[in-house]
From Swiss-Prot:
One of its GO terms (biological process) is sporulation resulting in formation of a cellular spore. This is RNA-binding protein RMD9, mitochondrial. It comes from the Eukaryota. Phosphorylated. Phosphorylation promotes binding to RNA. Residues 1-108 form a transit peptide. It is a peripheral membrane protein. The keyword Cell membrane does not apply.
Length: 622
């Protein structure tokens, strides 16, 4: 085992390895002080008399403490009272175990009711965990089951959020996934802090820590992970647990990415903890291989891959888990390797299904591959090859529609690069964009996410081309959500060729879509799109009065008081616009001069929901 010391002179507090201790052969202790301080004996302060106020806080605390001690002593002697206390403790523990059992049952069910029941059960577990007296009765099995459910909750919530066809707009403040995510994250941090406190030292094991670190990694709580690990390593009671191969497999890549250790230091830690092992666990082999690839040491990365293949053939460890590690390391050769020839070799093996093991082509690795290609000045044709092959691979999978987010991430990365390679409009760039759209349409139906991504990244500044892109929603019969209308409206803010009349048409189109889909309010996200298209655009001075006139007509259509307060507080930060904005609160219709005639249509669902002037006047003030 080794010690980690923090250097006071460095802001990053980089730890240094000082030593390794195995089987308690060496110990590190604090240097003894040269000054001996002896506590004074009570006789030195023997006062002849003491004065005590019976109503003093000290007296009160002493009395309360005495009562508590007396109660505890009585409880220890009174079998009836003791039995009652034990019964309550057992009831709490039984309830906790019952909730764990229910959570395991619900997590495997796919129906909506079971998923809701799972969330409610997990919430009960989080609340029960807050009881310190209950935690003291946990067994290792109880804590292990809790961390399993906690880790599954992280994964379950994240999958639901990313696979949903709905976009998590900022105005949807009652979003269930967002609410659950906050609770789960708090529970993860709470467990971490409880472990750091030493409360679970007697029942802690490597499997418990592994699940906790997995959960923290999902939330990208990297500083907290390193803090937990360093505290554990330096704890004489639990130090060896935190140097377990499973734990090192999770923490070493994080420590390297966060520049906590250099590549050489990582290798040293690895060698110190594996030199006496006959076989290294597959997780750690995978991790050291990933770190090697990230540092450019491809030879060692290939050595790790070969070691995993040998481990798979030997069947010394779970073949399923070894194959998962092989797949993970394979992905790192695709996404982390800066030699594109090597990356392409591993990429082709996946998309051509030419492997003895399965590799799930995760989009962050393809995202990284595309970025590496751009940074290394690869041709656009090569970038298109990787992009097109990935889209084809995804569309051929059974759950091709399962995770909409991966198409969004992939397309966003690709078109960000596309418009960097072609920053201006010309015949070549225009034809290339048409070619890309046609390629996508050959693989899978053109969808809203695809067109949203193109329009969102569009940077040529030509109104006619942008309108042609927008027409594709109709050409390809794309089912639209409010998001696409907002993106199109917002994009007009970047092009001065759009008149206020043009912007009003797009605003009305967005409202018509909301009304047709049963909205009875205008979401904050639509107000933000209008704001970015007008008053906060590069043409803001020419569109300011228009924005205020539109806002005046529709200000009571905001969702509710909470949304209204949020809307107003945004403008309080924009001091340069606050005087004009306050006209919405204290002005009348006559104060909004505008050359465009703004007429509110007859809606079926959209309607006034608040008294804007009444609410905002309490915030702004004259």
């Amino acid at each position: 085992m080794f010690r980690l010391l923090s250097a006071n002179t460095q802001q990053t507090l980089r730890p240094a390895i000082l030593s390794k201790v195995r089987s308690n052969k060496a110990n590190i202790s604090l240097p003894s002080s040269s000054i001996q301080v002896n506590p004074p004996s009570p006789a030195q302060y023997n006062l002849t008399c003491q004065f005590t106020r019976h109503n003093s806080s000290a007296s009160s605390q002493k009395t309360k403490s005495s009562k508590v001690d007396a109660f505890v002593n009585k409880a220890q002697r009174d079998p009836v009272l003791r039995e009652a206390l034990d019964s309550e403790a057992n009831s709490k523990l039984n309830y906790f175990k019952e909730q764990l059992s229910l959570a395991f049952q619900y997590r495997s069910a796919k129906d909506r009711d079971s998923q809701r029941a799972f969330v409610a059960t997990v919430d009960n577990l989080f609340k029960a965990f807050e009881d310190e007296s209950l935690r003291s009765s946990y067994s290792s099995r109880d804590l292990y089951s809790y961390t399993q459910i906690l880790n599954f909750s992280v994964y379950h919530n994240r999958t639901n959020r990313l696979s949903s066809s709905r976009n998590r707009d900022s105005d949807q403040y009652q979003n269930e996934n967002l609410h659950d995510e906050v609770l789960i994250k708090s529970a993860v941090l709470n467990l971490s802090e409880t472990i750091i406190s030493g409360e679970f030292n007697k029942i802690l094991n490597a499997n418990i820590l592994s699940y906790l670190f997995y959960s923290m990694k999902q939330f990208q709580l990297y500083p907290e992970m390193l803090n937990l690990w360093e505290n554990g390593v330096n704890d004489g009671e639990t130090g060896k647990l935190f140097l377990n191969e499973k734990i090192l497999a999770v923490i070493l890549p994080i420590a390297y990415e966060q520049k906590r250790f250099s590549y050489e230091e990582i290798l040293h830690i690895y060698e110190l903890n594996t030199k006496e092992l006959s076989t290294v666990q597959h997780e750690l082999l995978c991790s050291i291989g990933k770190i090697a690839i990230g540092s450019g040491d491809y030879s060692r990365g290939l050595d790790s891959l070969e070691a995993l293949l040998q481990l798979y053939e030997s069947k010394q460890q779970s073949t399923q888990h070894v194959l998962a590690s092989l797949g993970e390391l394979h992905l790192n050769f695709i996404g982390s390797c800066k030699d594109i020839k090597i990356s392409k070799h591993f990429f082709d093996k996946v998309v051509q299904y030419d492997l003895p093991y399965y590799v799930c082509l995760k989009v962050p690795y393809i995202q990284s591959l595309l970025q590496n290609c751009f940074e290394l000045n690869e041709s656009l044709d090569n970038i298109i090859y990787f992009w097109k092959s990935t889209i084809t691979h995804y569309s051929n999978e059974k759950n091709s529609a399962g995770l909409n987010s991966r198409y969004s991430i992939l397309n966003n990365t690709f078109f960000t690069i596309f418009f960097k390679i072609y920053p201006t409009l010309n015949a070549e760039s225009f034809n290339k964009l048409r070619e890309v759209i046609a390629l996508y349409a050959e693989i899978k139906p053109v969808d809203e996410v695809f067109l949203n991504t193109i329009i969102g990244n569009y940077s040529w500044g030509d109104k006619n081309v942008l309108e042609q892109l927008i027409e594709n929603y109709s050409i390809y019969n794309v089912k639209r959500t409010p998001v696409s209308y907002r993106i199109c409206l917002k994009k007009t803010g970047e092009l001065p060729q759009y008149t206020n009349e043009d912007i009003l048409i797009k605003w009305n189109d967005s409202l018509q879509h909301l009304d047709q889909n049963g909205f009875n309010y205008i979401p904050i996200a639509d107000w933000a799109a209008l704001r970015d298209a007008t008053i906060l655009s590069n043409s803001g001075s020419d569109r300011k009065d228009f924005y205020l006139a539109v806002a005046n007509q529709y200000k009571d259509y905001i969702q509710d008081q909470r949304s209204c307060i949020r809307f107003v507080k945004y403008w309080l930060k924009k001091r340069e616009h606050l005087k004009s904005f306050s006209t919405l609160t204290f002005g009348s219709d006559a104060d909004f001069s505008n050359e465009v005639d703004i007429v509110v249509p007859q809606f079926r669902h959209l309607k006034p929901n608040i008294n804007y002037q009444k609410i905002s006047s309490k915030i702004i003030g004259k």
